[in-house]
Amino acid sequence: MLLRIQLPTFKTGSYLVQSNYLHHQPTRPLVYFDHWAMMLFGGDSGLRRRFADSLRRTGGTLCLSTTHTGELCRVDDARHARDFDALLAEVMPRAFWIDTRRLLSERDRWTEYPPGDIHAAAEVMRSRRGDFGFYESVWTYGRRPRPGKSTLAEVFDTATLSTAQAVDLARQGEDFRRKAKTFQPKNGRAPAWVLLGELLRSTVLNDAQAFTANDSADMQHALSLLHCDYVLLDGGWTARAEGARKRLLEAGIRLGNVYSKRANGIDRFLADMETPASAAAK
């Protein structure tokens, strides 16, 4: 359903946003794409239309996050941003911005729907006909050098690298590794932290398994499994999620269906989206 929400004028980034309304509330099934999937569907008009048609038929919503924009700013090719914009234009207004940072807050109560990122949504509404699309605008701004300030690409690189280094440092501690081996997912902590603990167990217990800055970004995308019905992730993270599913379910945490390019994943995802009985995966 469409929802009209009164908003004040506020400043986000370098833009003054004067927006009276946000116009979308998420409705299931909720779908989330990793960067590669945004590119795949955005760059293929047939896949793009087929997916958008299935969203409209089921009343579903494509969920987006600041992780998408951070990763986007790291690439040199504007084609990535244009493919993102093509997908967004095809599905609008069936899009919703997730605030993944709030998912990691211990203070937040568990809710059926993910918290929204009102700033990102208002930024989309800044675009007018004839402007760059939202993602190309962010890509251009995010790579532009600013006197005395880091670019958005540099900020994202620093954050993902520091997360990777923190994981690598933590798993060198014997006590930490021992706790990871005996860890049991349970209620009482923010579900996002429980999910991350499960997804990272193999990395902590296996010294030979690298954990890079790219893995840090993939891990942020994987948080969408908590709320979304259909999630397309990198193959390695899809395997991690499936490996954690049973243990998390025993703790009362149900994950969405997850797909990758492997094992005919794109066709299986679209078939599930187009089957009414599969529309309520969560």
Give the ranges of each region predicted by the language model.
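Short, well-structured N-terminal submotif of metal-dependent ribonuclease cores
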Residues: 2-66, 70-214, 239-251, 267-277
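Acidic active-site catalytic centers that drive phospho-/nucleotidyl reactions
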Residues: 34, 218, 234
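Acidic, metal-associated active-site segment
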Residues: 72, 216-228
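Accessory, usually C-terminal, subdomains that scaffold auxiliary metal cofactors
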Residues: 227, 235-261
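Acidic, proline/glycine-rich low-complexity IDRs
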Residues: 256, 271, 279-281
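Pol beta-like nucleotidyltransferase catalytic core
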Residues: 263, 267, 281-282
